[in-house]
Regions:
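Short, low-complexity, intrinsically disordered N-terminal peptides in bacterial proteins
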Residues: 1-7, 80-85
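C-terminal edge-of-domain segments
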Residues: 61-85
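Small-residue-biased structural context
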Residues: 1-4, 15-18, 25, 74-76
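Amphipathic, hydrophobic secondary-structure cores in small proteins
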Residues: 14-65
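Intrinsic-disorder/low-complexity, polar/charged segments enriched in Ser/Thr/Lys/Arg/Asp/Glu/Gln
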Residues: 7-9, 36-40, 70-72
Length: 85
């Protein structure tokens, strides 16, 4: 069960999607993400190209492996204090 304090604002369940749809849906969801919000991406494989895109566009992410072998990737905007100058 997900903790109520960590309920994401948006969820993209990409387990049944084929590339490049998971990446496209994730980018669309990030555009719609409210300030300070979080996006949960559920995906059956590590989306390596997405990680660089997230970091380069000011997001941080946490990856956890699900019991079914898929990945939960929690994405949020990086805090300004941690930004690179």
């Amino acid at each position: 069960m997900m903790s109520p304090t960590h309920t994401p604002d948006l969820v993209v369940d990409a387990r049944a999607m084929l590339p490049p749809e998971p990446l496209e849906r994730t980018l669309e969801a990030l555009d719609a993400l409210p300030e300070g919000g979080t996006l949960l991406l559920i995906i059956p494989r590590q989306p390596a190209p997405l990680y660089d895109m997230l970091v380069n566009n000011g997001y941080t992410y946490e990856v956890k492996t699900r019991d079914d072998g898929a990945f939960d990737i929690l994405i949020r905007q990086a805090e300004q204090a941690h930004g690179d100058g």
